[in-house]
């Protein structure tokens, strides 16, 4: 894993190339959450892209073209347009931003002579061929720039036209400051970390994190498994989790993982009690029970107070902490205590804390602890693949130092 991260660290960064009077296309990640009125509820990803954009402004790039996706549109969907982002961008950058409906309109605007201009292209996923890594679309985007900058860590594990494809055909292709910061932070967590190194994994499914867990056992010392995915492990150990969500097909995989952890001397912690309910969406009865005594027809919705105490003690002894996935159904206030408590606990330690996953970040924001974590990764799937020991495809096509 470290060798692969080192390979990705060898990618050239924007500060190593001359952008003066150059046309720069930056693949940013503005895939941010919106409310029902299409207002941005968390602009973290937009703010994280600002240093790269500002660098281009300060170094007098001729034109700066921002390309991003938003959501998973099927064709053109007005509710997923990037046009409403203009005002937020202009306020954050203190600079005018011009919206381009399509590539043809953008090309026409680029022909006009003017001092440094910033363009925001409409949601790139509105264009057919983006997710298929269409070569013609990639070449079209690459033709717009002298320098291509990938600053979208969250999509760097996907071979899309605006990330992987454009980099292949651009004359100069480098990483932005955010991309560099992401890789450097992951490398810091695993290259001679202060030990014990603790990994906390939560979330709904074992299947989404099984590869991660198998590959990372050689690097960690302690492992907390919580969230709905822990139900599968509890059932594998013989506990009756009643109506709780379980991936029965992965019972044997869970047992094998626990055995592998034992052989590698990784201490594994599972919940010892739980907050359960008759109905997660409309709870009428909520109860705290030991995991060996779950109420019939109840579902596990959060970890209980005894588990919180146990996990707190583990966290207090860990100088390096990685966390991916909530510990319960944190979207509902009744079942958010475990995740919120954990966020406060990690924030109040001296540990180097690296946080990944959209749900985890959302929970940390709700807890008001965003500024108290060492590093919050902007990538969900990308950070998981990195932890699984993979080289993210989009790094392969960027220019290397040597």
Curated annotation (Swiss-Prot):
Can you say where in the cell this protein is located?
Answer: Cytoplasm
Please provide the record's keywords in A-Z order: ATP-binding, Cytoplasm, Glycolysis, Kinase, Nucleotide-binding, Transferase
Q: Which reactions appear under catalytic activity for this entry? A: (2R)-3-phosphoglycerate + ATP = (2R)-3-phospho-glyceroyl phosphate + ADP
Q: Superkingdom of the source?
A: Bacteria
Positions with a binding annotation for ATP: 209, 331, 357-360
Q: Which residues form the signal peptide?
A: none
Instruction: Name the pathway.
Output: Carbohydrate degradation; glycolysis; pyruvate from D-glyceraldehyde 3-phosphate: step 2/5
Gene Ontology process terms (BP): gluconeogenesis; glycolytic process
- Record-linked Gene3D superfamilies: Phosphoglycerate kinase, N-terminal domain
Q: Does the keyword Transmembrane apply?
A: no
Family matches, as SUPFAM superfamilies: Phosphoglycerate kinase
Which Gene Ontology terms cover its molecular function? ADP binding; ATP binding; phosphoglycerate kinase activity
Q: Where does substrate bind?
A: 29-31, 45, 69-72, 125, 158
Leading EC class: transferase
Q: Give GO cellular component annotations, separated by semicolons.
A: cytosol
Q: What is its EC number?
A: 2.7.2.3
Q: Which family does it belong to?
A: Belongs to the phosphoglycerate kinase family.
Please state what the protein is called.
Phosphoglycerate kinase
High-level lineage: Bacteria, Pseudomonadati, Campylobacterota, Epsilonproteobacteria, Campylobacterales
């Amino acid at each position: 894993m470290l060798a692969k991260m080192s390979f990705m660290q060898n990618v050239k960064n924007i500060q190593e190339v001359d952008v003066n009077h150059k046309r720069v296309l930056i693949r940013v990640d503005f895939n941010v959450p919106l409310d029902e009125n299409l207002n941005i509820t968390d602009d973290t990803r937009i703010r994280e892209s600002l240093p790269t954009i500002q660098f281009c402004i300060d170094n007098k790039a001729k034109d700066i073209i921002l390309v991003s996706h938003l959501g998973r549109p099927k064709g053109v969907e007005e509710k997923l347009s990037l046009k409403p982002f203009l005002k937020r961008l202009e306020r954050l950058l203190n600079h005018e931003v011009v919206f381009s409906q399509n590539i043809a309109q953008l090309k026409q605007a680029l022909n006009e002579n003017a001092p440094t201009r910033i363009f925001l292209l409409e949601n790139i996923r509105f264009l057919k061929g983006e997710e298929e890594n269409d070569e013609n679309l990639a070449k079209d985007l690459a033709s717009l720039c002298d320098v291509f900058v990938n600053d979208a860590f969250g999509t760097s594990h996907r071979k899309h036209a605006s990330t992987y494809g454009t980099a292949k055909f651009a004359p100069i292709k480098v990483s932005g400051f955010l991309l560099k910061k992401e890789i450097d932070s992951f490398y810091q967590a695993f290259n001679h970390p202060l030990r014990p190194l603790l990994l906390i994994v939560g979330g709904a499914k074992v299947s989404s994190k099984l590869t991660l867990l198998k590959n990372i056992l050689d690097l960690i010392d302690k492992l907390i498994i919580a969230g709905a995915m822990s139900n599968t492990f509890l059932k594998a150990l013989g506990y009756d989790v009643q109506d709780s969500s379980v991936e029965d097909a992965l019972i044997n995989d869970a047992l094998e993982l626990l055995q592998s952890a034992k052989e590698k001397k990784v201490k594994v912690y599972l919940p010892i009690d739980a907050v359960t309910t008759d109905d997660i969406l409309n709870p009428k009865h909520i109860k705290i029970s030991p995991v060996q005594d779950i109420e019939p027809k109840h579902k596990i919705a959060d970890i209980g107070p005894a588990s919180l105490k146990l996990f707190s003690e583990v966290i207090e002894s860990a100088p390096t902490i990685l966390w991916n996935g909530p510990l319960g159904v944190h979207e509902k206030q009744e079942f958010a205590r475990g995740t919120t408590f954990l966020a406060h606990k990690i924030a109040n330690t001296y540990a180097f804390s690296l946080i990944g996953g959209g749900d985890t970040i959302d929970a940390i924001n709700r807890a008001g602890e965003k500024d108290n974590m060492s590093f919050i990764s902007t990538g969900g799937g990308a950070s998981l693949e990195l932890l699984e020991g993979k080289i993210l495809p989009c790094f392969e096509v960027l220019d290397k130092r040597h």
